[in-house]
Amino acid sequence: MTCDNPSVWKAKMLLTCKIALISALGVILAALSANTYADDMVVNAKNSLEWNRKEAFYHAIGNAEAIQGKQKIRAESLKAFYDPETVERTITRIVADGNASFADENHNGSGQKLDYDARKETYVLNGPAAVISGPDGSGAAEKTIIFKRAAQIVELVKDAEIKLKDGRHLSGQEITIYHDETNNILRIAAAGNVTITQADGSKATANKADYNRAADSALLTGNVIVKDRETELAGDRAEVDFATGISKMLSDKSGGRVSGRFTRLKE
């Protein structure tokens, strides 16, 4: 079944999902203001809407968007899959293609493609140049960004980078961000050519890094180099206290040594 513009699909997500087709914007706005439709999902498009009963999905084409409460998904093409076994036709997944983006009350992100699992409350953004932002800063990845809303975890894969609002940058091949219940960063774990750059320009590099937001400190492991201007420390492990500015270089368990190179005093 195909519907040409103007037209709108309404689908209530999860247990209370209902499907309706509304053809006038004024009716949509009136419906959205009523408590009856408070949890409904509204899907609209510029060009057309298709209902594929065989494969159980609705297809919005041309500047498509899906809106439910404070959640919004946009793309050139959008497919909303539903569970055909339920009378309510519960929406279980949304696949968006072409300049895809999402936004909720705390985060927004974009990529070439987007896949949202409604039951797991998980967004998958595919690159190149996928990005996501939240209360503490923004992140980017060349391949994939996975945002697990229920677990409050963000995973960035390949050429990943985080820019925090306090001026710090962190990059690596893989970065995992853990949020607290207020959507602020609690912990960051990074692996693969990790670089941490401070607001003052000092840098630390390592194979892996684990940043503790509450303690404002990081544990760096594997080929660690901490550099501040002409001062450089090298070793297998390092503890960096960002609050005090103290960096402690530690040797590995095999008996390796740590080293330091310092600016020569002026004569």
Q: Residue spans of the language-model regions?
A:
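Mature-chain termini and adjacent capping regions
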Residues: M1-E267
